Amino acid sequence: MASAHIEHKLSLLPDLPGCYLMKNLNSQIIYVGKAKNLKNRVRSYFKSSHTGKTARLVSEIADFEFIVTSTDKEAFLLEITLIQKHQPYFNIKLKKGTGYPYIKITNERDPQILIVSDVRKDGGYYFGPYPNVYAAQETVNFIQKVYPLRRCHGFQKRPCLYYHMGQCLGACFKTVPVAEYDAQIKRIKSFLNGHVETVKKQLTKRMDQAAADLEFERAAELRDQLNYIEMTVEKQKIISNDNTPRDLFNFYLDKGWLSIQVFFIRQARLMKREKRLFPVVSTAPEEMTSFILQFYNRKNNVLPREVLVPNGLDKQVLSDILGIPVRTPQRGQKKDLLDMAQKNARIVLEEKFRLLELDERKTTGAMQEITDALGIPAGHKIEAFDHSHIQGADLVSAMVVFTDGQPNKKLYRKYKLRTVDHADEAASTREVIRRRYTRLLKEHAALPDLILMDGGEIQLEAAKDVLENELGIATPVAAMVKNDHHKTADLLASAGDQHLHLDPKSQGFYLLQRIQDEVHRFAITFHRQVHTKHSLSSRLDEIPGVGPKTRNKLLRKFGSMSKIAGASLEEIQSLGIAKNVAQTVKFSLAGGGVTPKHYQKGAT
């Protein structure tokens, strides 16, 4: 079942094509996919049952984001770029491959046209990448027939087979003029950049003639050639027609918030996207100009050869300061990319507003529900306490702080109890409450609006007694009560009181659960640390010849009994520990029990 966070993000998905990026709990991208309809595709992961690898993927998804494109093909091309960049774990098939192919015209005296898997800085002309590998290969075959270059291995004193077939200019047996190659390359570049109408008309005419002559196989071949040209030479927004490194900025402004999208186009591909959201004071053009200048002032941002921005920005100022052309495209491929960036900026901002509304209900709204239920003034800050021990040993307390419904971990505190040496909930509560709020009074620090105790009447009454009768503090206190399954059940305002019966489906109840789970987790974690350290110290203290200084040296260096036991005699002695003591430590931790005679001091 999807988390509440995922559910709300699913409701924000648009009915548009694009790519989605699935993330795990560590915010690592674990899967990249594409969709004709983002809303339907992404929702299908969480609304349908799955098996095998898909089930494993869904179980690890903690969050996702998406990028909107204009067509399904753009999503295809963007998908491979994102996979190559992030190498997601679950994209195994695409990860192991070399990606979609490119069509390349080589930079040689006698150039060739080839299918290649990557782009190199070798002076060649690259076109692509192309999602349909077979269509790209067939298009190259077509070009080799219509616009031949060199198709053989080079000079071999006699014409090759391809020359006789009209698919090679003859570098195999003669010197082909550079001008002839240049003219042919110009035609190929024009063809691959989309100027295909003349060729398509010729093919269509030949296809119709073949059909009229009842040469149906030949007509089918010509029809397929037309389809391959459509698939490979079709205009693309994600892929530009040149390899100029450029960055593209666009924005969307609403309700005092500015949403910015930055597209990084490298090697004719959208290599990276950054998105930013912040409230603004000045006008959008002023904020954008300032943002762009600060953006390139960062250490890791390298200037491209060109920057594209929307209308309204002072391009001359930007260009003068950055030292590169800053332009606003008015039509064509670059303008379409700029529009796509603005569309994504708008979608991100709309999502932000919906999440803000949701967060307000979850945080400040939830806080309001709790204070209303207790009948106390609305507040912002809650401090919650819990104790932890094992059969009365290593007693500790912990405090967590929630501000406007959000954990404020910088204010968390840990307490080793000093006056309690056995399991006594009331005494533990008195000590930690006394220590915490005596200090706040002494420092003239702000008191919380509500104090919550994890427990029941015992903890509640002990806390109230210290606050009211010893410290004169009137801060409201309540106890977070658990049910028989050790789950959050309700709030208790005073001893003998009826439970408040918060609605289990309310945001206030969910906040109470989060606070109780967090303070319990924090206390348990601290107790384990203390108990582990004490266990190590106690066992070392039992070894003859090991005093506090030696014990501390060993713990600081090795950290655990297993590592001390696994250390060599020389490693232990390197800490300034005498050889006979080091031998005793080694023997004792190896399970030897009483130190043998030959390990006693003075033995040889």
From Swiss-Prot:
Gene Ontology MF term list: DNA binding; excinuclease ABC activity
PROSITE patterns for this protein: GIY_YIG, UVR, UVRC
Residue ranges occupied by any GIY-YIG domain in the UniProt entry: 15-92
GO annotation, biological process: nucleotide-excision repair; SOS response
Superkingdom in the source lineage: Bacteria
Entry GO CC: cytoplasm; excinuclease repair complex
Record's subcellular location: Cytoplasm
Pfam families xrefs: GIY-YIG, HHH_5, UVR, UvrC_RNaseH, UvrC_RNaseH_dom
Keyword match DNA repair: yes
Keywords noted in UniProt: Cytoplasm, DNA damage, DNA excision, DNA repair, Excision nuclease, SOS response
SMART domains per the UniProt record, alphabetical: GIYc
UVR domain span: 197-232
Keyword flag Ribonucleoprotein: no
Role according to the record: The UvrABC repair system catalyzes the recognition and processing of DNA lesions. UvrC both incises the 5' and 3' sides of the lesion. The N-terminal half is responsible for the 3' incision and the C-terminal half is responsible for the 5' incision.
Family under the similarity heading: Belongs to the UvrC family.
Subunit structure as annotated in this protein's UniProt entry: Interacts with UvrB in an incision complex.
Protein's name in the database: UvrABC system protein C
